[in-house]
């Protein structure tokens, strides 16, 4: 509980409202999924420590939160439209490649970056070998409530940070904190969900050697998918 309080407090104090809101929503939903068992009363008792941790973290962060709210009310961020000029920071489909090839569109260090926006706001690199692991998780990993939760988290975050009619419609509204910065910051949630699912998949491969043949199939499929995305990006 103390570790959770400390983590949430530091998240607030980090000064990134979007990431803070994402973190609190994920923690709350995960607590409900993980601890909501049996009757209503028992479930409320199980989730009370999480609620207490959230309240304590907000209370500890009050010396920063209160002046920040006053500053936001006087800020022009709510009325300016700078993110609209960059399509709200919604990523083009070709940026899927950056999940597995970080420098596919160059790197600012070598001064050859030619991708969308800037490198740091749009990079969701999770490792070159992650794609077959995610495919394995989607097809062969034993599904539980927690696994479904992280898959849903992955799908929702991808939809919201990439350019499509639904994400554009949502970001066309002025939702405080959430739609006042680039949508690509949702990649924080995407990479988190991918990391968790990859860990579950690798653990199952390690504990059940008979699953290794299935993993090899996923490696072949992943190469086919990657080549397809690469060819599609080349056409774009």
Name what the model sees in each region.
Residues 113-122, 152, 156-193, 204-215, ...:
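Membrane-helix boundary/interfacial segments in multi-pass membrane proteins
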Residues 53-138, 183-188, 232-236:
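Periplasmic/ER-lumenal interhelical loops and adjacent helix-loop junctions
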Residues 6-33, 56-68, 189:
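Transmembrane helices and adjacent periplasmic/lumenal helix-loop junctions
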Residues 12, 18-25, 184-191, 215-236:
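Membrane-embedded alpha-helical segments of integral membrane proteins
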Residues 38-48, 134-166, 208-219:
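Membrane-interface helix-loop-helix junctions at transmembrane boundaries of multi-pass membrane enzymes
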Residues 25-33, 131-138, 194-206:
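Transmembrane alpha-helical segments
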Residues 42-69, 83-86, 149-158, 217-230:
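Hydrophobic alpha-helical membrane-interfacial segments at the cytosolic entry of transmembrane helices
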Residues 20, 48, 120-127, 147, ...:
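Alpha-helical transmembrane segments of integral membrane proteins
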